[in-house]
Amino acid sequence: MEFVSLASGSKGNCYYLASNEGAFLVDCGISMKRIEQGVAALGKGGMDAIRGILLTHEHRDHIAGLGPVLRRHHIPVYGTRDTLDALEEKVIGKVDRHLFYALDDEVLTLADFHISYSRVSHDAADPVSYQITWQDKKIGMLTDSGVLSDENMNALYDSDILLIEANHDVDMLRDGPYTYYLKQRIGGRFGHLSNSNCAQALPEIMSARTKHVVLAHLSEQNNLPMCAYQTVCDALAAHLPKGHAVDVHVASQKTPLALSLPSLT
């Protein structure tokens, strides 16, 4: 199974998961050209193998490429009812809304992936994070949340691959050029997790099976990859049991990051 961050950051987000049975995207916030090129490079059947697009929420950096992708490839889109209703024609253009499917409380199955979700704290209509199981493996994903609830922590716990937001360094945000209002929004309850928020949570949601931690949705203005990486690594070194080896990765806005999980057979 392949897990690929095609792009992650404040300018656009898109993740790709694929097995021999099929594939899907989480968010569609970059250009169709980048998505098509990134998917084709992985050799898993290209866009024809994609069974669905899961949306976390309706902000532009998560849906900017959705309209062109739907008009060319006619892929089903899944999200909460309020998220789908909030997709504006001025952003995505005219699309066939018969391709939209509202999530319910049942586990969604795409190819041989099983997908559940938990709601997050962000200034959007009804934002969610996704938890994916494939065979005996689990991938936990959460970005765009100002806080982590107990529900979020439980949903992410015991993941083989754990993708979590490390959006900003608190000092860089405080001392940076953003307006007071924007600083309060980003650092507030309905904003984004900081490096320190992420570092504090990780030891509680990791388990012995966690092999990869992916730091995601970094701000270009208010963070540095090495700052996020070092903050998290210091926390893990202080709190994880000796002998628990985990690879920490920083997802990039421009360069894909690919991880693999082995099959049972």
Regions found by a protein language model. Give the residues of each.
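Metallo-beta-lactamase
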Residues: 81-129, 133-136
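Active-site environment of divalent metal-dependent phosphoester hydrolases
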Residues: 11, 59-63, 84-86, 124-125, ...
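Active-site metal-binding motif and surrounding structural segment of the metallo-beta-lactamase
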Residues: 32-79
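Metal-dependent catalytic neighborhoods of phosphoester/phosphodiester hydrolases
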Residues: 64-73, 88-91, 223-230
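Conserved beta-strand hairpin/beta-sheet module of binuclear metal-dependent hydrolase folds
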Residues: 1-42, 46, 126-144, 161
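Active-site neighborhood of phospho(di)ester-bond hydrolases with catalytic His/Asp-centered motifs
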Residues: 26-29, 50-58, 78-81, 140-143, ...
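Structured catalytic core of nucleotide-sugar glycosyltransferases
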Residues: 4-14, 56-66, 117
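Cap/insert and terminal regions of metallo-dependent hydrolase folds
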Residues: 150-250
